[in-house]
Amino acid sequence: MPMSLGNAFIKNFLGKAPDWYKLAIISFLIINPFVFFLVDPFVAGWLLVVEFIFTLAMALKCYPLQPGGLLAIQAVAIGMTKPEMVYHELQANLPVLLLLVFMVAGIYFMKELLLFIFTKILLGIQSKILLSVAFCVAAAFLSAFLDALTVIAVVISVAVGFYSIYHKVASGKGTTSAHDHTHDEEISELTRDDLENYRAFLRSLLMHAGVGTALGGVMTMVGEPQNLVIAKQAGWEFGEFIIRMLPVTLPVFFCGILTCALVEKFKVFGYGAELPNNVRQILVEFDNKERANRTKQDVAKLWVQSAIAVWLIVGLALHVAEVGLIGLSVIILATAFTGVIEEHSMGKAFEEALPFTALLAVFFAVVAVIIDQALFKPVIDAVLHVEDKGAQLALFYVANGILSMVSDNVFVGTVYINEVKTALVEGVITRDQFDLLAVAINTGTNLPSVATPNGQAAFLFLLTSALAPLIRLSYGRMVIMALPYTIVLALVGLAGIVFFVEPMTAWFYDAGWIIHRTGEVVAPVISGGH
């Protein structure tokens, strides 16, 4: 029986997404205006946040850009926020958008070097525990100087490379032939178990690396975008920022690494999968074949990419330009000196990042609603009016942590530092208390936010990447795998805030490592973004 036009419209709406999912999105779109106009705009704002989180959680059913975008368009249309506010959020977050467009594409042109290095690491370290710790520490070290998104882009690029090599051979093809690694139809039953184990192995390495970016990112002022905002507000330089964070970040780092080793040893929370022997054999053969077939031109490419990698790390660590612009320089240098000059060859590099860039723009529309409807105001006001200084530090950390799990952690950090800055200007708190609160805000936004992909842009990027469905990494699985880290990082961080930060900071003052700041302040900034 031929399909009616009405049915065709319904069939086309959100494509292959399940019918219940389509129904859920339609119901959200019907309910939201009623709640906004007839119940309470504040309630409608929180409802929108929950609905947006739902679209992220269902990322494997339907990419969140379409359903999330429809919700955001409606929110602007009914007046929950204004187009100008969304544009302002995008302006404030231009560095992040540039980072995604250019840096992720730049990493694409360095994948030969990355695959070369990581193949050596993967095949050289036999112990899964040591390998996991190596990934976690490497990601932490890189994230202290580079942006976490850049580090995750590197790891994703490497993982896709490893996955496609094995998938190609398991489908009965050679390592050099063309192959679509998104389809499993050609995989035989014998190799299917290996494939599942390999997926679990890659999932665990990616999650260790993801958490590593949080462990390293919290330590320095260039590690995460909100750190930069907080450092600017407090007037701290690179070295002072590291020292002030140490009472919290050092114990958290060591406990994070210990957690990495323990979850692997006891094979809990989805960790512990070993690299299957058949897969190792295929990767060894691939490595040998690559080495045997490497021409002088290939070697020259590796040298060029190594030089560009040095420029990338130095440029980012010294902050010689905005991250996105350094990414653009990487694209130009890498393509010019490795001979990639056709437009269609360059286009592939942008495929990974642009859908996520669009999704992030939608995310900032939701952040605009959070600001306009003052959704976090009750929490912030309650914490600021606590009299006991020690309790206030702990509460700031906890409140930041909880809000960072559901919202953009840069937004949360920026809102809090502005409120604290205002309190300092009005004489509600002393400058020393302001400095301690800045530490609580920075660690509170960075550490507990590993709980969900909403909190960490790097996790969100991983969840919505082309790699996530290949290795079966869903929102729920990500939350479960992050759980041991969430508990350890959040609690050790809290212990650092409660027990270590005040006495250690006093000791740093006495030792002359840092100086007592006077009341000088920078004008409060408006929301920033990832």
From Swiss-Prot:
Instruction: For this UniProt record, give its keywords in alphabetical order, as a comma-separated list.
Output: Antiport, Cell inner membrane, Cell membrane, Ion transport, Membrane, Sodium, Sodium transport, Transmembrane, Transmembrane helix, Transport
Keyword DNA-binding attached = no
What Pfam families does the entry give? NhaB (PF06450)
Q: Which residues form a coiled coil?
A: none
Q: Which chemical reaction does it catalyze?
A: 2 Na(+)(in) + 3 H(+)(out) = 2 Na(+)(out) + 3 H(+)(in)
At the top level, the lineage of the source is Bacteria
Q: Where in the cell is it found?
A: Cell inner membrane
Topology in membrane: Multi-pass membrane protein
Q: What residue intervals traverse the membrane?
A: 13-33, 98-118, 123-145, 149-166, 205-225, 238-258, 308-328, 330-350, 356-376, 393-413, 451-471, 480-500
The keyword Transmembrane is annotated on this UniProt entry: yes
Give a GO cellular-component term.
Answer: plasma membrane
- Assign the protein's first listed, main location to one coarse class: membrane
Which Gene Ontology MF annotations are present? sodium:proton antiporter activity
The UniProt family comment states: Belongs to the NhaB Na(+)/H(+) (TC 2.A.34) antiporter family.
Q: What functional role does this protein have?
A: Na(+)/H(+) antiporter that extrudes sodium in exchange for external protons.
Question: What is the name listed in the Swiss-Prot or TrEMBL entry for this protein?
Answer: Na(+)/H(+) antiporter NhaB
Supply the source organism for this entry: Vibrio atlanticus (strain LGP32) (Vibrio splendidus (strain Mel32))
Gene this protein is translated from: nhaB
